[in-house]
Amino acid sequence: MPKYRKKPVVIEAVQYLGKQNYQDICKFVGKELTMEYMDTEQILTIETLEGELKANKGDYIIKGVQGEFYPCKPDIFEKTYEPAE
């Protein structure tokens, strides 16, 4: 079976920390986002190429290579990405 490696692409991302950086996330994506409250969680709704996805506190919001935005769980983000200069 052929194997493939991800191309080294530098991305922009911001970790969603909840209400405290909601405005920073909105500036990053360039528009106001809907924030829902589920119990004590503050969940963001993000328009992606595949439709609406939810971002929970702790998730990273990533700007993709086509300028699209999508959420990524922190454990996946940390396995996939490392800081770039």
What are these regions (language model features)?
Residues 1-40, 45-49:
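N-terminal non-globular leader segments, chiefly Sec-dependent signal peptides
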Residues 50-85:
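Short, compact, well-ordered microdomains
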